[in-house]
Amino acid sequence: MTVFNPVWRVKIQGVEYTTYTLSNLTITSGRNNIYQQAQAGYCNLELLNLTQAIVNIHINDSVSIELQDSTATYVPIFGGTVVDFGVEIITAGSVGINQVLKITALGALSRLPKALTDGVLSQDFDGDQIYEILQDLLLNNWGEVPAALQWQNYDPSETWANAQNVGLGEIDRPGNYELAQRSSDRTDVYSLVSALATSGLGYIYEDASGLISYADSTHRSIYLATNGYTDVTANHALFNGLKIETRAGDVRNDITLKYNTNSNNEVSAEDIPSIDVYGRLAQVITTTVKHTVDAQDQADFYLTLRATPQANFTSITYQLTNPELDDADRDSLINVFMGLPLRISDLPPNMASGTFLGFVEGWSFKAAYNEIAVTLNLSPISYSLQAMKWEQVPIGESWNTITGALTWETALVVA
């Protein structure tokens, strides 16, 4: 048994708020399901102010929320900017006035729907096209540096490569699918980048510091092959509200996939046995994949994995202050990220046969004084796995782990 008392570090515009007590916190990150791209992370933060001290917080100030793990190391769990700020009196009397500072912050993805681009792109792979769009918005050049900026305000070790990075994280480059060129057509950055990510069978996301990142189609397969599953037990979760759902809405047995420049061409795939059982459940997927063979591969991939329904883990909650939760599991949950492979054991036998294998799609932290819980939603492992290229295979992979009858063309990582 391990006792865990949350220790927080809240920074706003680089200033650590050490004299204020965190009274309430809600953080939501990721996405609700695998069929959509991630939305901006959301943070609702309340700090108790017992001294009526002047608070220097403004709209667009940076926000960083960190939580200590079992090694007393601060782990970032949210990064973003202030969008709403208020001061409210909660009690008043002869002994004084108590206030609460109410702060709402959003992650860097919130900037993309409000930024416009002509979106001119040459034919290139998905990761490179996404980087081309995002770097123009999130990496400043000399002409975009604020005129009043002074060198003395920079860390001497800072390099120009990241000195004016205002939100760009890790981008998987070049990606795995070659996408068609794009001519000038004004649109918002979020719509364009989301479409490019969908075309590459990947997803955009915010990391724990709030930076915008992109994971390509084999990102999860490679991570799983390299690091394996994070194992947790349902015995340490809050059983009330633990939920697995199997939905007809997840079934896709008639796929039309549009591809090429302006999505002018299309391929199709259908699964007759699935149609016989569930009826025809069709979907049109719009991409800018360049090559017909890649478009057909994508259509077949959607069909192979989604022709029959699979259980989704829509909700499981862990109270991180639970003393039965060991340090390793607690630290893994504090470090949760979109795409974390989890193996949840000790479920009731009528729920995923007692063990669920999946990837984290979204999560929320909820905290009060000396309390914190994390709620996860996961997709089935097979919804995400993609065959890797030779050069992507982890160097530690052993030949004896691969069945002799497996062809590389159809190999999926199931470790």
Residue ranges of predicted features:
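Beta-strand-rich assembly/attachment modules of structural machines
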Residues: M1-D128, A368-A373, I381-L385
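Short coil-to-beta-strand transition motifs
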Residues: T71-T81, P348-F359
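Glycine-centered loop/turn motifs
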Residues: H58-S62, R186, F337-S345
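Terminal peptide-recognition signature
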Residues: L45, A105, L196, L257, ...
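Acidic, small/polar-enriched beta strand-loop surface segments
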Residues: M1-T18, S122-Y131, Q135, S191-L357, ...
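Conserved long hydrophobic alpha-helices within structured protein cores
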Residues: A40-Y42, L137, L333
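Charged- and aromatic-enriched interaction segments used to assemble
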Residues: D69-Y74, T91-T246
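Short regulatory "switch" loops immediately downstream of catalytic or recognition motifs
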Residues: L48-L50, I65-D69, F85-T91, W142-E144, ...
